[in-house]
A protein has these predicted regions:
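Conserved beta-strand
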Residues: 398-403, 408-425, 449-451
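Conserved "ABC signature" C-loop
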Residues: 466-512
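Cytosolic ends of transmembrane helices, especially the final helix of ABC transmembrane type-1 domains
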Residues: 232-236, 247, 264-268, 274, ...
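Membrane-integrated ABC transporters
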Residues: 1-51, 60-80, 94-98, 124-182, ...
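ABC-family ATPase nucleotide-binding domain "signature/switch" substructure
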Residues: 441, 476, 509-603
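Loop segments that connect adjacent transmembrane helices in multi-pass transporters
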Residues: 234-291
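A hydrophobic transmembrane-helix motif
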Residues: 39-42, 46, 176-205, 211-232, ...
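Transmembrane-helix motif of ABC transporter permease domains
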Residues: 29-54, 67-107, 147-148, 204-233, ...
Protein backbone atom coordinates (compact mmCIF):
# COMPACT_ATOMS: atom_id res chain seq x y z
CA UNK A 1 0.00 0.00 0.00
CA UNK A 2 1.38 3.39 -0.99
CA UNK A 3 1.95 6.23 1.46
CA UNK A 4 -0.90 8.25 -0.07
CA UNK A 5 -3.28 5.31 0.38
CA UNK A 6 -2.24 4.92 4.01
CA UNK A 7 -2.74 8.63 4.59
CA UNK A 8 -6.16 8.51 2.93
CA UNK A 9 -7.15 5.61 5.16
CA UNK A 10 -6.11 7.50 8.29
CA UNK A 11 -8.10 10.57 7.21
CA UNK A 12 -11.10 8.38 6.43
CA UNK A 13 -10.94 6.92 9.94
CA UNK A 14 -10.67 10.37 11.52
CA UNK A 15 -13.68 11.54 9.48
CA UNK A 16 -15.63 8.54 10.78
CA UNK A 17 -14.75 9.46 14.37
CA UNK A 18 -15.74 13.08 13.72
CA UNK A 19 -19.03 12.03 12.10
CA UNK A 20 -19.91 9.83 15.08
CA UNK A 21 -18.79 12.39 17.68
CA UNK A 22 -20.17 15.67 16.34
CA UNK A 23 -23.91 15.00 16.96
CA UNK A 24 -23.43 14.80 20.74
CA UNK A 25 -21.47 18.04 20.95
CA UNK A 26 -24.18 19.75 18.85
CA UNK A 27 -27.09 18.17 20.74
CA UNK A 28 -29.34 19.65 23.42
CA UNK A 29 -26.58 18.75 25.89
CA UNK A 30 -23.94 20.58 23.87
CA UNK A 31 -23.07 23.22 26.49
CA UNK A 32 -22.60 20.65 29.24
CA UNK A 33 -20.61 18.44 26.87
CA UNK A 34 -18.42 21.28 25.65
CA UNK A 35 -17.96 22.57 29.19
CA UNK A 36 -16.82 19.16 30.42
CA UNK A 37 -14.49 18.81 27.45
CA UNK A 38 -13.01 22.27 28.05
CA UNK A 39 -12.51 21.47 31.75
CA UNK A 40 -10.75 18.19 30.90
CA UNK A 41 -8.48 19.97 28.42
CA UNK A 42 -7.66 22.62 31.04
CA UNK A 43 -6.87 19.96 33.63
CA UNK A 44 -4.61 18.15 31.16
CA UNK A 45 -2.75 21.40 30.50
CA UNK A 46 -2.51 21.95 34.25
CA UNK A 47 -1.11 18.45 34.74
CA UNK A 48 1.60 19.07 32.14
CA UNK A 49 2.47 22.39 33.79
CA UNK A 50 2.88 20.60 37.13
CA UNK A 51 5.16 18.04 35.47
CA UNK A 52 7.34 20.89 34.21
CA UNK A 53 7.54 22.25 37.76
CA UNK A 54 8.44 18.81 39.13
CA UNK A 55 11.12 18.46 36.45
CA UNK A 56 12.71 21.71 37.63
CA UNK A 57 12.37 20.48 41.23
CA UNK A 58 14.40 17.39 40.26
CA UNK A 59 17.43 19.51 39.36
CA UNK A 60 17.41 21.57 42.55
CA UNK A 61 16.68 18.61 44.84
CA UNK A 62 19.39 16.29 43.48
CA UNK A 63 21.94 19.11 43.35
CA UNK A 64 21.22 19.66 47.05
CA UNK A 65 21.85 15.97 47.70
CA UNK A 66 25.14 16.03 45.79
CA UNK A 67 26.25 19.17 47.63
CA UNK A 68 24.95 17.86 51.00
CA UNK A 69 22.98 21.10 51.46
CA UNK A 70 20.44 20.24 54.17
CA UNK A 71 18.71 23.64 54.08
CA UNK A 72 17.86 23.38 50.38
CA UNK A 73 17.05 19.69 50.81
CA UNK A 74 14.33 20.32 53.42
CA UNK A 75 13.02 23.35 51.56
CA UNK A 76 12.63 21.29 48.40
CA UNK A 77 10.80 18.56 50.31
CA UNK A 78 8.31 21.21 51.41
CA UNK A 79 7.99 22.46 47.84
CA UNK A 80 7.45 18.93 46.60
CA UNK A 81 4.62 18.46 49.10
CA UNK A 82 2.47 21.22 47.64
CA UNK A 83 3.46 20.33 44.07
CA UNK A 84 2.34 16.75 44.71
CA UNK A 85 -0.91 17.87 46.37
CA UNK A 86 -1.84 20.10 43.44
CA UNK A 87 -0.95 17.36 40.98
CA UNK A 88 -3.10 14.84 42.90
CA UNK A 89 -6.11 17.19 42.92
CA UNK A 90 -5.73 17.75 39.17
CA UNK A 91 -5.39 14.00 38.53
CA UNK A 92 -8.46 13.16 40.62
CA UNK A 93 -10.73 15.71 38.94
CA UNK A 94 -9.33 14.92 35.51
CA UNK A 95 -10.29 11.28 36.07
CA UNK A 96 -13.72 12.18 37.47
CA UNK A 97 -14.66 14.65 34.72
CA UNK A 98 -13.34 12.30 32.02
CA UNK A 99 -15.50 9.47 33.34
CA UNK A 100 -18.47 11.83 33.65
CA UNK A 101 -18.10 12.96 30.04
CA UNK A 102 -17.79 9.36 28.88
CA UNK A 103 -20.91 8.19 30.70
CA UNK A 104 -22.99 11.21 29.61
CA UNK A 105 -21.86 10.77 26.02
CA UNK A 106 -22.57 7.05 26.15
CA UNK A 107 -26.05 7.67 27.57
CA UNK A 108 -26.89 10.23 24.87
CA UNK A 109 -25.44 8.19 22.00
CA UNK A 110 -27.10 4.96 23.14
CA UNK A 111 -30.50 6.64 23.40
CA UNK A 112 -30.03 8.40 20.05
CA UNK A 113 -29.07 5.21 18.17
CA UNK A 114 -31.73 3.22 20.02
CA UNK A 115 -34.39 5.77 19.05
CA UNK A 116 -33.30 5.71 15.41
CA UNK A 117 -33.18 1.90 15.46
CA UNK A 118 -36.78 1.75 16.71
CA UNK A 119 -38.07 4.59 14.48
CA UNK A 120 -39.69 4.01 11.07
CA UNK A 121 -39.46 0.24 11.68
CA UNK A 122 -35.70 0.42 11.04
CA UNK A 123 -35.06 -2.54 13.36
CA UNK A 124 -37.51 -4.65 11.33
CA UNK A 125 -36.20 -3.52 7.95
CA UNK A 126 -32.61 -4.19 9.00
CA UNK A 127 -33.48 -7.73 10.05
CA UNK A 128 -35.16 -8.30 6.68
CA UNK A 129 -32.20 -6.81 4.81
CA UNK A 130 -29.77 -9.18 6.53
CA UNK A 131 -31.14 -12.02 4.42
CA UNK A 132 -30.58 -10.40 1.05
CA UNK A 133 -26.97 -9.20 1.42
CA UNK A 134 -24.04 -10.89 -0.30
CA UNK A 135 -23.05 -14.28 1.08
CA UNK A 136 -19.54 -13.05 1.76
CA UNK A 137 -18.07 -9.66 2.53
CA UNK A 138 -14.93 -8.41 0.85
CA UNK A 139 -12.49 -6.95 3.33
CA UNK A 140 -9.91 -4.23 3.50
CA UNK A 141 -6.23 -5.00 3.78
CA UNK A 142 -6.53 -4.66 7.57
CA UNK A 143 -9.19 -7.38 7.68
CA UNK A 144 -12.18 -5.04 8.07
CA UNK A 145 -15.34 -5.30 5.96
CA UNK A 146 -15.83 -2.78 3.21
CA UNK A 147 -18.27 -0.13 4.53
CA UNK A 148 -21.90 -0.22 3.43
CA UNK A 149 -21.78 -3.68 1.88
CA UNK A 150 -24.40 -5.36 4.02
CA UNK A 151 -26.54 -4.64 7.03
CA UNK A 152 -24.54 -5.05 10.26
CA UNK A 153 -25.43 -7.99 12.46
CA UNK A 154 -25.94 -8.00 16.24
CA UNK A 155 -27.41 -4.50 16.76
CA UNK A 156 -27.65 -5.34 20.46
CA UNK A 157 -23.85 -5.47 20.59
CA UNK A 158 -23.56 -2.15 18.77
CA UNK A 159 -25.88 -0.45 21.26
CA UNK A 160 -24.67 -2.10 24.46
CA UNK A 161 -20.95 -2.67 23.94
CA UNK A 162 -19.63 -0.72 20.97
CA UNK A 163 -21.07 2.64 22.05
CA UNK A 164 -19.42 2.20 25.45
CA UNK A 165 -16.06 1.31 23.90
CA UNK A 166 -16.24 4.11 21.34
CA UNK A 167 -17.09 6.89 23.78
CA UNK A 168 -14.55 5.82 26.40
CA UNK A 169 -11.74 5.30 23.89
CA UNK A 170 -12.51 8.47 21.93
CA UNK A 171 -12.30 10.59 25.06
CA UNK A 172 -9.39 8.66 26.56
CA UNK A 173 -7.25 8.45 23.44
CA UNK A 174 -7.94 11.99 22.21
CA UNK A 175 -7.11 13.47 25.62
CA UNK A 176 -4.06 11.21 25.82
CA UNK A 177 -2.91 12.45 22.42
CA UNK A 178 -3.47 16.07 23.45
CA UNK A 179 -1.52 15.43 26.63
CA UNK A 180 1.30 13.87 24.61
CA UNK A 181 1.48 16.84 22.23
CA UNK A 182 1.48 19.43 25.03
CA UNK A 183 4.03 17.40 27.01
CA UNK A 184 6.28 17.19 23.96
CA UNK A 185 6.06 20.94 23.33
CA UNK A 186 6.71 21.68 27.00
CA UNK A 187 9.67 19.37 27.53
CA UNK A 188 11.42 19.36 24.17
CA UNK A 189 12.78 22.86 24.87
CA UNK A 190 13.94 21.81 28.34
CA UNK A 191 15.66 18.71 26.95
CA UNK A 192 17.20 20.71 24.10
CA UNK A 193 18.75 23.19 26.52
CA UNK A 194 20.03 20.51 28.89
CA UNK A 195 21.39 18.03 26.37
CA UNK A 196 24.08 20.31 24.93
CA UNK A 197 25.79 19.52 21.65
CA UNK A 198 27.40 16.36 20.35
CA UNK A 199 30.56 16.86 18.28
CA UNK A 200 32.32 14.27 16.17
CA UNK A 201 34.71 14.04 13.21
CA UNK A 202 34.02 12.19 9.99
CA UNK A 203 36.24 12.11 6.91
CA UNK A 204 38.45 14.84 8.27
CA UNK A 205 35.51 17.17 8.93
CA UNK A 206 34.04 18.15 12.29
CA UNK A 207 30.31 18.03 12.92
CA UNK A 208 28.21 19.32 15.79
CA UNK A 209 24.65 18.20 16.54
CA UNK A 210 22.81 20.64 18.85
CA UNK A 211 20.08 19.25 21.11
CA UNK A 212 21.56 15.78 20.77
CA UNK A 213 19.23 14.17 23.35
CA UNK A 214 16.16 15.45 21.50
CA UNK A 215 17.28 13.84 18.25
CA UNK A 216 18.08 10.60 20.09
CA UNK A 217 14.57 10.60 21.58
CA UNK A 218 13.03 11.18 18.13
CA UNK A 219 15.13 8.41 16.59
CA UNK A 220 14.39 6.02 19.44
CA UNK A 221 10.62 6.56 19.26
CA UNK A 222 10.45 6.56 15.45
CA UNK A 223 12.07 3.13 15.30
CA UNK A 224 9.78 1.93 18.09
CA UNK A 225 6.62 3.24 16.39
CA UNK A 226 7.48 1.65 13.03
CA UNK A 227 8.21 -1.73 14.63
CA UNK A 228 5.07 -1.51 16.78
CA UNK A 229 2.88 -0.86 13.74
CA UNK A 230 4.52 -3.73 11.86
CA UNK A 231 3.98 -6.14 14.77
CA UNK A 232 0.52 -5.00 15.85
CA UNK A 233 -1.23 -4.20 12.58
CA UNK A 234 -3.12 -7.56 12.40
CA UNK A 235 -4.78 -6.68 15.73
CA UNK A 236 -7.25 -4.35 13.95
CA UNK A 237 -8.91 -7.08 11.93
CA UNK A 238 -8.57 -9.65 14.73
CA UNK A 239 -10.34 -7.33 17.21
CA UNK A 240 -13.16 -6.74 14.74
CA UNK A 241 -13.55 -10.47 14.10
CA UNK A 242 -13.39 -11.32 17.82
CA UNK A 243 -16.30 -9.03 18.63
CA UNK A 244 -18.36 -10.50 15.79
CA UNK A 245 -17.72 -14.11 16.84
CA UNK A 246 -18.40 -13.37 20.51
CA UNK A 247 -21.72 -11.76 19.58
CA UNK A 248 -22.74 -14.71 17.39
CA UNK A 249 -21.92 -17.16 20.19
CA UNK A 250 -23.92 -15.08 22.68
CA UNK A 251 -26.84 -14.84 20.25
CA UNK A 252 -27.03 -18.63 19.86
CA UNK A 253 -26.94 -19.09 23.64
CA UNK A 254 -29.95 -16.76 23.92
CA UNK A 255 -31.79 -18.72 21.22
CA UNK A 256 -31.24 -21.99 23.10
CA UNK A 257 -32.70 -20.39 26.21
CA UNK A 258 -35.69 -18.98 24.31
CA UNK A 259 -36.50 -22.28 22.59
CA UNK A 260 -35.55 -24.53 25.50
CA UNK A 261 -38.88 -26.40 25.53
CA UNK A 262 -38.88 -27.14 21.79
CA UNK A 263 -35.25 -28.28 21.93
CA UNK A 264 -36.00 -30.54 24.90
CA UNK A 265 -39.04 -32.06 23.17
CA UNK A 266 -37.05 -32.65 19.98
CA UNK A 267 -34.16 -34.14 21.99
CA UNK A 268 -31.95 -31.61 20.26
CA UNK A 269 -29.52 -31.05 23.12
CA UNK A 270 -26.69 -32.89 21.38
CA UNK A 271 -27.14 -30.88 18.19
CA UNK A 272 -27.30 -27.59 20.08
CA UNK A 273 -24.25 -28.50 22.14
CA UNK A 274 -22.39 -29.24 18.91
CA UNK A 275 -23.56 -25.95 17.37
CA UNK A 276 -22.55 -24.00 20.46
CA UNK A 277 -19.23 -25.80 20.65
CA UNK A 278 -18.57 -24.99 16.99
CA UNK A 279 -19.26 -21.30 17.57
CA UNK A 280 -17.21 -21.28 20.76
CA UNK A 281 -14.34 -23.03 18.99
CA UNK A 282 -14.48 -20.23 16.42
CA UNK A 283 -14.28 -17.68 19.25
CA UNK A 284 -11.28 -19.46 20.76
CA UNK A 285 -9.50 -19.88 17.43
CA UNK A 286 -9.63 -16.15 16.72
CA UNK A 287 -8.78 -15.34 20.34
CA UNK A 288 -5.66 -17.51 20.19
CA UNK A 289 -4.54 -15.58 17.11
CA UNK A 290 -5.36 -12.34 18.93
CA UNK A 291 -3.36 -13.15 22.06
CA UNK A 292 -0.51 -14.45 19.91
CA UNK A 293 -0.20 -11.04 18.27
CA UNK A 294 -0.76 -9.30 21.60
CA UNK A 295 2.07 -11.38 23.10
CA UNK A 296 4.44 -10.13 20.42
CA UNK A 297 3.26 -6.56 20.91
CA UNK A 298 3.49 -6.71 24.72
CA UNK A 299 6.97 -8.22 24.49
CA UNK A 300 8.21 -5.47 22.21
CA UNK A 301 6.56 -2.59 24.09
CA UNK A 302 7.98 -3.82 27.41
CA UNK A 303 11.45 -4.13 25.87
CA UNK A 304 11.01 -0.66 24.41
CA UNK A 305 9.85 0.78 27.73
CA UNK A 306 12.55 -0.83 29.87
CA UNK A 307 15.31 0.25 27.51
CA UNK A 308 13.99 3.81 27.73
CA UNK A 309 14.68 3.83 31.49
CA UNK A 310 18.47 3.55 31.10
CA UNK A 311 18.85 5.04 27.62
CA UNK A 312 19.12 8.72 28.73
CA UNK A 313 21.67 7.83 31.42
CA UNK A 314 23.80 5.98 28.86
CA UNK A 315 23.76 8.94 26.49
CA UNK A 316 24.31 11.62 29.17
CA UNK A 317 26.79 9.67 31.32
CA UNK A 318 29.95 10.93 29.52
CA UNK A 319 29.03 14.56 30.26
CA UNK A 320 28.29 13.71 33.91
CA UNK A 321 31.56 11.85 34.47
CA UNK A 322 33.50 14.63 32.76
CA UNK A 323 32.00 17.12 35.21
CA UNK A 324 30.11 19.05 32.53
CA UNK A 325 26.82 18.53 34.38
CA UNK A 326 25.88 17.89 38.01
CA UNK A 327 23.69 15.11 39.42
CA UNK A 328 20.67 17.40 39.46
CA UNK A 329 21.02 18.19 35.76
CA UNK A 330 21.52 14.48 35.00
CA UNK A 331 18.27 13.65 36.80
CA UNK A 332 16.52 16.56 35.08
CA UNK A 333 17.77 15.29 31.71
CA UNK A 334 16.50 11.81 32.57
CA UNK A 335 13.10 13.19 33.61
CA UNK A 336 12.80 15.43 30.53
CA UNK A 337 13.91 12.62 28.23
CA UNK A 338 11.33 10.33 29.84
CA UNK A 339 8.58 12.90 29.19
CA UNK A 340 9.65 13.53 25.59
CA UNK A 341 10.09 9.82 24.93
CA UNK A 342 6.72 9.10 26.56
CA UNK A 343 5.02 11.72 24.40
CA UNK A 344 6.67 10.45 21.22
CA UNK A 345 5.83 6.86 22.24
CA UNK A 346 2.10 7.57 22.57
CA UNK A 347 1.48 5.57 19.40
CA UNK A 348 3.54 2.62 20.69
CA UNK A 349 1.92 2.60 24.13
CA UNK A 350 -1.63 2.84 22.79
CA UNK A 351 -1.41 0.66 19.70
CA UNK A 352 -3.63 -2.10 21.09
CA UNK A 353 -6.25 0.46 22.15
CA UNK A 354 -6.01 2.20 18.78
CA UNK A 355 -6.64 -1.11 17.02
CA UNK A 356 -9.71 -1.75 19.18
CA UNK A 357 -10.88 1.86 18.67
CA UNK A 358 -10.63 1.60 14.91
CA UNK A 359 -12.50 -1.73 14.81
CA UNK A 360 -15.25 -0.32 17.05
CA UNK A 361 -15.50 2.83 14.94
CA UNK A 362 -15.89 0.73 11.79
CA UNK A 363 -18.69 -1.29 13.38
CA UNK A 364 -20.54 1.77 14.65
CA UNK A 365 -20.09 3.58 11.34
CA UNK A 366 -21.64 0.68 9.43
CA UNK A 367 -24.49 0.51 11.98
CA UNK A 368 -25.12 4.26 11.81
CA UNK A 369 -25.03 4.19 8.00
CA UNK A 370 -27.54 1.34 7.97
CA UNK A 371 -29.82 3.30 10.30
CA UNK A 372 -29.58 6.36 8.07
CA UNK A 373 -30.56 4.29 5.03
CA UNK A 374 -33.46 2.63 6.83
CA UNK A 375 -34.76 5.86 8.36
CA UNK A 376 -35.05 7.54 4.99
CA UNK A 377 -38.55 7.70 3.58
CA UNK A 378 -39.12 4.45 1.68
CA UNK A 379 -39.57 4.84 -2.04
CA UNK A 380 -42.19 2.12 -2.22
CA UNK A 381 -45.47 1.98 -0.35
CA UNK A 382 -47.27 5.24 0.27
CA UNK A 383 -49.49 4.67 3.27
CA UNK A 384 -52.32 7.10 4.05
CA UNK A 385 -54.26 6.77 7.28
CA UNK A 386 -57.67 8.35 7.58
CA UNK A 387 -58.51 10.71 10.38
CA UNK A 388 -61.87 9.10 11.15
CA UNK A 389 -62.30 6.46 13.83
CA UNK A 390 -65.55 4.71 12.93
CA UNK A 391 -68.69 5.04 10.86
CA UNK A 392 -70.03 4.05 7.46
CA UNK A 393 -67.23 5.90 5.61
CA UNK A 394 -64.47 4.01 7.43
CA UNK A 395 -63.04 1.59 4.87
CA UNK A 396 -59.84 -0.29 4.18
CA UNK A 397 -58.63 0.21 0.62
CA UNK A 398 -55.54 -0.45 -1.47
CA UNK A 399 -54.93 0.58 -5.07
CA UNK A 400 -52.11 -0.27 -7.44
CA UNK A 401 -50.59 -2.54 -4.80
CA UNK A 402 -47.45 -4.37 -5.94
CA UNK A 403 -45.58 -6.70 -3.60
CA UNK A 404 -42.11 -8.09 -4.10
CA UNK A 405 -39.97 -10.58 -2.23
CA UNK A 406 -36.48 -9.63 -1.00
CA UNK A 407 -35.13 -11.71 -3.90
CA UNK A 408 -36.81 -9.36 -6.39
CA UNK A 409 -39.58 -11.76 -7.43
CA UNK A 410 -43.01 -10.12 -7.74
CA UNK A 411 -45.78 -11.64 -5.62
CA UNK A 412 -48.65 -9.35 -6.60
CA UNK A 413 -48.86 -6.65 -9.23
CA UNK A 414 -51.23 -3.70 -9.41
CA UNK A 415 -53.76 -5.31 -7.05
CA UNK A 416 -56.82 -3.45 -5.75
CA UNK A 417 -58.88 -4.33 -2.71
CA UNK A 418 -61.52 -2.74 -0.54
CA UNK A 419 -63.25 -3.73 2.69
CA UNK A 420 -66.25 -1.81 3.99
CA UNK A 421 -67.53 -1.92 7.58
CA UNK A 422 -69.28 -5.20 8.28
CA UNK A 423 -67.58 -6.99 5.34
CA UNK A 424 -65.69 -9.60 7.30
CA UNK A 425 -63.12 -10.95 4.85
CA UNK A 426 -61.09 -14.18 4.83
CA UNK A 427 -57.78 -14.32 2.95
CA UNK A 428 -56.68 -17.78 1.85
CA UNK A 429 -53.98 -19.25 -0.35
CA UNK A 430 -51.28 -21.89 -0.42
CA UNK A 431 -48.40 -21.72 2.03
CA UNK A 432 -45.75 -19.26 0.90
CA UNK A 433 -48.14 -17.37 -1.37
CA UNK A 434 -47.63 -14.07 0.47
CA UNK A 435 -50.68 -13.82 2.72
CA UNK A 436 -48.66 -12.53 5.67
CA UNK A 437 -46.66 -10.31 3.32
CA UNK A 438 -49.92 -8.69 2.17
CA UNK A 439 -50.81 -7.98 5.80
CA UNK A 440 -47.38 -6.45 6.37
CA UNK A 441 -47.88 -4.23 3.33
CA UNK A 442 -51.28 -3.11 4.63
CA UNK A 443 -49.63 -2.28 7.95
CA UNK A 444 -47.00 -0.24 6.09
CA UNK A 445 -43.96 -2.18 7.33
CA UNK A 446 -43.10 -4.22 4.21
CA UNK A 447 -40.34 -2.27 2.40
CA UNK A 448 -40.66 -4.02 -0.99
CA UNK A 449 -44.12 -2.71 -1.84
CA UNK A 450 -45.64 -0.02 -4.05
CA UNK A 451 -49.10 1.45 -4.10
CA UNK A 452 -51.59 3.44 -2.04
CA UNK A 453 -53.11 2.03 1.14
CA UNK A 454 -55.76 3.73 3.29
CA UNK A 455 -56.26 2.20 6.72
CA UNK A 456 -59.06 2.97 9.16
CA UNK A 457 -57.87 4.84 12.20
CA UNK A 458 -58.90 2.33 14.87
CA UNK A 459 -57.24 -0.87 13.67
CA UNK A 460 -55.23 -3.64 15.34
CA UNK A 461 -53.11 -6.40 13.84
CA UNK A 462 -52.67 -9.84 15.40
CA UNK A 463 -49.44 -11.36 14.00
CA UNK A 464 -48.65 -15.06 13.80
CA UNK A 465 -46.12 -14.66 16.59
CA UNK A 466 -47.45 -12.04 19.03
CA UNK A 467 -44.94 -10.25 21.23
CA UNK A 468 -45.25 -9.97 25.00
CA UNK A 469 -42.60 -8.07 26.98
CA UNK A 470 -41.04 -9.60 30.07
CA UNK A 471 -42.58 -8.19 33.21
CA UNK A 472 -46.00 -8.21 34.82
CA UNK A 473 -48.95 -9.84 33.09
CA UNK A 474 -50.88 -6.55 33.14
CA UNK A 475 -48.04 -4.87 31.22
CA UNK A 476 -47.95 -7.72 28.69
CA UNK A 477 -51.71 -7.49 28.21
CA UNK A 478 -51.85 -3.69 27.81
CA UNK A 479 -48.69 -3.43 25.61
CA UNK A 480 -47.74 -1.04 24.09
CA UNK A 481 -49.94 1.24 26.19
CA UNK A 482 -49.28 1.69 29.93
CA UNK A 483 -51.22 -0.78 32.05
CA UNK A 484 -52.39 2.09 34.27
CA UNK A 485 -54.76 3.11 31.47
CA UNK A 486 -56.96 0.11 32.27
CA UNK A 487 -58.66 -0.91 35.49
CA UNK A 488 -58.18 -4.34 37.05
CA UNK A 489 -61.79 -5.13 36.20
CA UNK A 490 -61.20 -4.38 32.50
CA UNK A 491 -58.02 -6.46 32.42
CA UNK A 492 -59.65 -9.42 34.15
CA UNK A 493 -62.73 -9.23 31.93
CA UNK A 494 -60.54 -9.31 28.81
CA UNK A 495 -58.75 -12.43 30.10
CA UNK A 496 -62.03 -14.15 30.90
CA UNK A 497 -63.51 -13.27 27.50
CA UNK A 498 -60.38 -14.73 25.88
CA UNK A 499 -60.89 -18.01 27.77
CA UNK A 500 -58.02 -17.34 30.20
CA UNK A 501 -59.83 -17.05 33.55
CA UNK A 502 -56.94 -18.75 35.33
CA UNK A 503 -54.66 -15.79 34.58
CA UNK A 504 -57.02 -13.18 36.02
CA UNK A 505 -55.49 -13.56 39.50
CA UNK A 506 -51.91 -13.23 38.18
CA UNK A 507 -51.96 -9.68 36.83
CA UNK A 508 -49.03 -8.56 38.99
CA UNK A 509 -46.96 -11.69 38.50
CA UNK A 510 -43.72 -10.99 36.63
CA UNK A 511 -42.38 -13.59 34.20
CA UNK A 512 -41.18 -14.32 30.69
CA UNK A 513 -44.69 -14.93 29.40
CA UNK A 514 -43.57 -15.99 25.93
CA UNK A 515 -41.77 -18.94 27.54
CA UNK A 516 -44.22 -19.47 30.39
CA UNK A 517 -47.40 -19.90 28.35
CA UNK A 518 -48.26 -22.49 25.72
CA UNK A 519 -48.81 -21.59 22.08
CA UNK A 520 -52.58 -21.68 22.51
CA UNK A 521 -52.42 -19.54 25.65
CA UNK A 522 -50.26 -16.99 23.85
CA UNK A 523 -52.79 -16.75 21.02
CA UNK A 524 -55.62 -16.28 23.51
CA UNK A 525 -53.58 -13.63 25.34
CA UNK A 526 -53.12 -11.77 22.04
CA UNK A 527 -56.88 -11.87 21.48
CA UNK A 528 -57.41 -10.73 25.09
CA UNK A 529 -55.30 -7.69 24.23
CA UNK A 530 -57.63 -6.93 21.29
CA UNK A 531 -60.73 -7.40 23.44
CA UNK A 532 -59.24 -5.05 26.03
CA UNK A 533 -58.45 -2.27 23.54
CA UNK A 534 -61.68 -2.74 21.52
CA UNK A 535 -60.60 -1.60 18.04
CA UNK A 536 -63.13 -1.23 15.24
CA UNK A 537 -60.98 -3.19 12.79
CA UNK A 538 -59.01 -6.40 13.39
CA UNK A 539 -56.54 -7.95 10.95
CA UNK A 540 -55.66 -11.42 12.25
CA UNK A 541 -52.89 -13.61 10.80
CA UNK A 542 -53.47 -17.25 11.83
CA UNK A 543 -54.58 -15.89 15.20
CA UNK A 544 -56.24 -19.15 16.35
CA UNK A 545 -54.17 -21.83 14.60
CA UNK A 546 -53.08 -23.40 17.93
CA UNK A 547 -56.63 -23.57 19.38
CA UNK A 548 -59.24 -26.29 19.25
CA UNK A 549 -62.33 -25.65 17.15
CA UNK A 550 -64.74 -24.79 20.03
CA UNK A 551 -62.30 -22.23 21.47
CA UNK A 552 -61.63 -20.84 18.00
CA UNK A 553 -65.33 -20.40 17.30
CA UNK A 554 -65.98 -18.76 20.67
CA UNK A 555 -63.18 -16.24 20.19
CA UNK A 556 -64.09 -15.41 16.60
CA UNK A 557 -67.67 -14.85 17.70
CA UNK A 558 -66.43 -12.28 20.23
CA UNK A 559 -64.11 -10.60 17.72
CA UNK A 560 -66.93 -10.39 15.20
CA UNK A 561 -69.31 -8.89 17.75
CA UNK A 562 -66.64 -6.40 18.85
CA UNK A 563 -65.94 -5.09 15.33
CA UNK A 564 -69.62 -4.90 14.43
CA UNK A 565 -70.40 -2.86 17.56
CA UNK A 566 -67.60 -0.45 16.68
CA UNK A 567 -68.61 -0.19 13.01
CA UNK A 568 -65.60 -2.01 11.57
CA UNK A 569 -64.76 -5.45 10.22
CA UNK A 570 -62.40 -8.41 10.47
CA UNK A 571 -59.86 -9.45 7.87
CA UNK A 572 -58.39 -12.86 8.66
CA UNK A 573 -55.81 -15.29 7.36
CA UNK A 574 -56.80 -18.86 8.21
CA UNK A 575 -56.94 -22.33 6.70
CA UNK A 576 -59.66 -24.00 8.80
CA UNK A 577 -63.20 -24.22 7.41
CA UNK A 578 -64.57 -23.33 10.85
CA UNK A 579 -63.17 -19.79 10.51
CA UNK A 580 -64.83 -19.25 7.13
CA UNK A 581 -68.26 -19.23 8.77
CA UNK A 582 -67.47 -15.87 10.40
CA UNK A 583 -66.57 -14.12 7.11
CA UNK A 584 -68.89 -13.02 4.30
CA UNK A 585 -66.18 -12.37 1.73
CA UNK A 586 -63.31 -14.53 0.56
CA UNK A 587 -60.05 -13.44 -1.07
CA UNK A 588 -57.82 -16.07 -2.58
CA UNK A 589 -54.24 -15.86 -3.77
CA UNK A 590 -53.94 -18.04 -6.86
CA UNK A 591 -50.71 -19.12 -8.50
CA UNK A 592 -50.17 -17.78 -12.01
CA UNK A 593 -48.52 -19.90 -14.70
CA UNK A 594 -45.17 -19.02 -16.25
CA UNK A 595 -41.91 -17.64 -14.91
CA UNK A 596 -42.40 -14.01 -15.98
CA UNK A 597 -44.59 -11.46 -14.21
CA UNK A 598 -46.24 -11.79 -10.80
CA UNK A 599 -46.37 -15.17 -9.06
CA UNK A 600 -49.93 -14.76 -7.72
CA UNK A 601 -53.15 -12.91 -8.37
CA UNK A 602 -55.75 -11.84 -5.81
CA UNK A 603 -59.32 -12.91 -6.58
Amino acid sequence: MSWSEKTARVWRFLRQVWHLSLPYFNSAEKWKARGLLAAIVALNLGAVYMLVQINEWNRVFYDALQQKNATVFWAQLGRFTWLAMIFIVIAVYRFYLTQLLQVRWRAWMTRDLMHRWLTHDAFYRMELARYIGPAEESTTEAGLPQPGQRVPDNPDQRLQEDVNIFTSQTVGLSMGFLNAVVTLLSFVGILWGLSGSFSFSLGGSSFTIPGFMVWMAVLYCTVGSVLTHYIGRPLIGLNFEQQRREANFRHHLVRVREYSEAIALDKGQTVEEHNLDTRFASVLANYLQLIGKQKQLVGFTNLFGQAAVVFPFIVAAPRFFSGAIQLGELMQISSAFDRVQGALSWFVDNYDSLASWRATTERLTSFEAALSRQNQAPAGLERAQTATTSGASDTLTANGLTLQLPTGATLLEDAALSVAPGEHTLLQGPSGSGKSTLFRALAGIWPWAKGDVALPANVMFIPQRPYFPDGSLRDALAYPEPASRYSDAELKQALEDALLPGLAARLDERDNWTQKLSGGELQRLAIARVLLKQPAWVLADEATSALDVPAEEALYQRLKALTERAGGAMVSIAHRPSVAAFHQRHWRLKRLPGEQGPLYTLT
